[in-house]
Amino acid sequence: MKYLVDTHAHTIASTHAYSTVHDYIAVAKQKGLKLFAITDHGPDMADAPHFWHFVNLRVLPRIVDGVGILRGIEANIKNDAGEIDYFGDYLQELDIVLAGFHEPVFPPSDKQTHTQALINAIESGNVDIITHPGNPAYPIDITAVAAAAARCHVALEINNSSFEMSRKGSEANCVAIAKAVRDAGGQLVMGSDSHVAFSLGEFSQALAIIEEAEFPEERLLNKSPEALLTFLSKRGHKTLDDFAEL
């Protein structure tokens, strides 16, 4: 099956990434993608865009040349309380909120601290998707996190970049996560974590993890624009009718 949705992409607004919104649209068209999310790093990262970047995402058109653009963020989990670096009413203006651990904001600690931070972020209601939870630098209680995510209708990400450019050693953790989410009745999403447009929609290694875990496709958010948009709508995002024509 060809997957037409990517929830995780960074633009030049995050200065360690190298592509513009226009670049991503062009690649999405070339590859036949129907929907992708702009999710630059939250403002607590050293080279992240200013807070205003996320507020002003509303200027982006919803659909360009048949490609839908979700206005999002990859927020930073800041502490074991699960707080993120974007807040309040501004969260409601975004279409999608990703959050994860990043070493400049939350240095690795211990399994109990990491687990509590993720569960608190999941239970906060502020986060739709937890990014790269299989990072071996941040060991977690996988069963507990998967159960919390399923209970709170938060998706966990299988991050394709973790097997290519960063977070080496994620494979075994990600297989365990996929199996735990499968058994808990939760949802997964594959994210390219693109930092250059050429990798948008690239899921080959993440898909191998999904298949090894025998994860049911009906609970994989990439399977269609409708699957992701329905998930986001159920999580309280109000402005998604604009994508009805996709």
Curated annotation (Swiss-Prot):
Binding site for Zn(2+) 3: 74, 102, 132
Enzyme class: hydrolase
Protein's GO biological process: bacterial-type flagellum-dependent swarming motility
Residues that coordinate or bind Zn(2+) 2: 16, 41, 195
Residues at which Zn(2+) 1 binds: 8, 10, 74, 193
UniProt cross-references to PANTHER family, sorted A to Z: PHOSPHATASE YCDX-RELATED (PTHR36928:SF1)
UniProt entry keywords in alphabetical sequence: Hydrolase, Metal-binding, Zinc
GO molecular function, one term: phosphatase activity
Protein name per Swiss-Prot or TrEMBL: Probable phosphatase Ssed_2939
NCBIfam families in alphabetical order: PRK09248.1
Family: Belongs to the PHP family.
Keyword Magnesium: no
EC number: 3.1.3.-
UniProt-listed Gene3D superfamilies: Metal-dependent hydrolases (3.20.20.140)
An annotated GO cellular component: cytosol
Entry note: cofactor: Binds 3 Zn(2+) ions per subunit.
Necessary cofactors: Zn(2+)
